[in-house]
């Protein structure tokens, strides 16, 4: 459960990300594909090379979804309902992959914003991404 301080940290972090969201999303995806090669199986039609337009485009989708979630942190199920349906029923993504991408997002954010990535912010973002993952996998049952 996100505390009021967590929600403040999440919103402040997403404001600092600003126009870099798409680039950070793509970088996190690249990290995930390199660190956890089995995740590539969900993207057989993608050019997974560094800087590919498809990875950049999907990175933007990830970043936009997370920005929307951060803006609606008090109603994550409502904000992510369509994505939850898509990932559970059409794409059938293994839920563990959300944890892997979350980890790669945290690493990416820490690399780009080391001064702002305090232990408290890290914990808040980790809880936020875990909450997003929980919502995205809630319709698997």
UniProtKB/Swiss-Prot annotation:
Its tissue distribution reads: Red blood cells.
Q: Which residues carry this modification: N6-succinyllysine?
A: 7, 11, 16, 40
Which residues carry the post-translational modification Phosphoserine, per the record?
3, 35, 49, 102, 124, 131, 138
Q: Which GO terms describe its biological process?
A: hydrogen peroxide catabolic process
Q: According to the UniProt record, list the residues that bear Phosphotyrosine.
A: 24
Q: Which residues carry this modification: Phosphothreonine?
A: 8, 108, 134, 137
Q: What molecular function does GO assign, one term?
A: oxygen carrier activity
Q: What does this protein do?
A: Involved in oxygen transport from the lung to the various peripheral tissues.
Q: What is this protein called?
A: Hemoglobin subunit alpha
Native source organism of the sequence? Urocitellus parryii (Arctic ground squirrel)
Q: What is the lineage of its organism?
A: Eukaryota, Metazoa, Chordata, Craniata, Vertebrata
């Amino acid at each position: 459960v996100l505390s009021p301080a967590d929600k403040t940290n999440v919103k402040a972090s997403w404001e600092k990300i600003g126009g870099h969201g798409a680039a950070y999303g793509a970088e996190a995806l690249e990290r995930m594909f390199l660190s956890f090669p089995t995740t590539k199986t969900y993207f057989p039609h993608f050019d997974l090379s560094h800087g590919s337009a498809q990875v950049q485009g999907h990175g933007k989708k990830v970043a936009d979804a997370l920005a929307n979630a951060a803006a609606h942190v008090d109603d994550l199920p409502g904000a992510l309902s369509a994505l939850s349906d898509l990932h559970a029923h059409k794409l059938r993504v293994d839920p563990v992959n959300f944890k892997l991408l979350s980890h790669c997002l945290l690493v990416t954010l820490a690399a780009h914003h080391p001064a702002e990535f305090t232990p408290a912010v890290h914990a808040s973002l980790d809880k936020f991404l875990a909450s997003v993952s929980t919502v995205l996998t809630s319709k698997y049952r």
